[in-house]
């Protein structure tokens, strides 16, 4: 873990600049990955690789007129809220940038960020913020809760490998484990990565990305391969993936168009059910690979409960769900209302609904 990369060497609570190196005490967490500190001249410093409460040595990588950006080179005094995460890629992979921070501190930081935004940007008075901001509703799981992960291809020593975007988004970090992914499927990621690495040695798969969805409730496991249109070794890919990961569904999502505006052309079933199912809020949803669904099923249920509580829908009422997606709120509303009008422009989500 990243906590072991920077040994404790001394305690210093003041902030001073030494050439292009600075000694900083991190005051809070910002939106995104960075910790916030201030230089002696009062300029804000966004610090990569640090958490609130850390005292660090940091190298300035950008010095702007109103703020600076810096990269942690050494943790001098760790925050009492710093933890040893279960993932060895925290601080390298860009997927869990707060992984070194305790859950309690994460929740407090998110609430403080919201309060600060309402005051600074929304111009709400502190007493109004106190009334508006309620305690955070959250799930119990710190790790092992994600029902979906996505992998990006990269070339290592002339061979295609799969990984995740790094802290530097231009780089791909090759991984074969992710403690954020559903803990009921501990071998799924490694099996899929191994199978596709093997296939890439003898076939040009043209992979643009790979999606893996898992449900502990339905036991559904889907592997989605995003590729351009054209020829594809369907039988070999489906056979190797089935033997390695035993998914309930293997699909190929074909896309076309300019790189920054790719659109889904077709979803092709290679093996199994051709879709992914999840039980949620007293119902079941069936989703195709391109459709969006909250990556935290229990978190989605909390959102549904809050919305239903606020709306208090009645049997004789009509409801309109705008930007409804595949129906996360539409379906619970339909079980409570007389009629629901669902509005959505994205084709795959409309077909799923």
Short names for language-model regions:
Residues 147, 221, 316-317:
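Nucleotide donor/acceptor-binding cores
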Residues 9-89, 119, 169:
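Terminal RNA-binding accessory module
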Residues 217-228, 284-288:
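Short, aliphatic-rich beta-strand segments
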Residues 53, 181, 296:
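Short, conserved phosphate/pyrophosphate- and ester-handling motifs at nucleotide-, phospho-/glycolipid
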Residues 2-3, 12-25, 31, 232-353:
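Rossmann-like S-adenosyl-L-methionine
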Residues 57-59, 150, 320:
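Hydrophobic beta-strand signal
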Residues 73-85, 91-205, 217:
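Extended interfacial segments that mediate partner engagement and assembly in macromolecular machines
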């Amino acid at each position: 873990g990243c906590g072991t990369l920077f040994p404790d060497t001394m305690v210093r609570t003041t902030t001073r600049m030494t050439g292009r190196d600075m000694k900083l005490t991190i005051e809070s967490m910002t939106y995104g990955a960075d910790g916030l500190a201030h230089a002696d001249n009062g300029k804000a410093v966004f610090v990569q690789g640090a958490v609130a409460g850390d005292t660090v040595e940091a190298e300035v990588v950008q010095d702007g007129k109103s703020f600076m950006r810096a990269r942690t080179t050494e943790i001098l005094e760790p925050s009492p809220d710093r933890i040893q995460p279960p993932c060895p890629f925290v601080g390298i992979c860009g997927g869990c940038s707060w992984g070194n921070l305790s859950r309690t501190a994460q929740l407090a930081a998110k609430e403080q960020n919201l309060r600060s935004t309402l005051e600074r940007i929304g111009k709400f008075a502190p007493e109004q913020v106190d009334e508006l901001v309620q305690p955070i509703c959250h799930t119990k799981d710190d790790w092992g809760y994600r029902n979906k992960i996505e992998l990006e291809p990269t070339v290592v020593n002339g061979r295609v490998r799969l990984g995740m975007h790094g802290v530097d988004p231009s780089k791909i970090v090759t991984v074969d484990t992710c403690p954020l992914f559903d803990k009921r499927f501990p071998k799924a990621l490694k099996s899929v990565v191994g199978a596709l690495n093997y296939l890439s040695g003898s076939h040009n798969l043209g992979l643009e990305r790979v999606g893996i969805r898992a449900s502990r409730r339905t036991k559904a496991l889907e592997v989605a391969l995003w590729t351009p249109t054209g020829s594809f070794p369907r039988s070999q890919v489906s056979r190797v993936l089935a033997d390695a990961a035993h998914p309930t569904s293997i699909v190929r999502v074909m896309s076309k168009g300019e790189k920054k505006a790719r659109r889904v052309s077709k979803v092709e079933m290679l093996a199994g059910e051709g879709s992914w199912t999840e039980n949620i809020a007293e119902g079941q949803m069936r989703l195709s690979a391109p459709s969006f669904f909250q990556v935290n099923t229990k978190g989605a249920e909390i959102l549904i409960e809050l919305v239903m509580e606020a709306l208090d829908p009645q049997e004789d009422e009509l409801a309109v769900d705008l930007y409804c997606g595949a129906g996360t709120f539409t379906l619970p509303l339909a079980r409570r209302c007389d009629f629901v009008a669902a509005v959505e422009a994205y084709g795959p989500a409309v077909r799923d609904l």
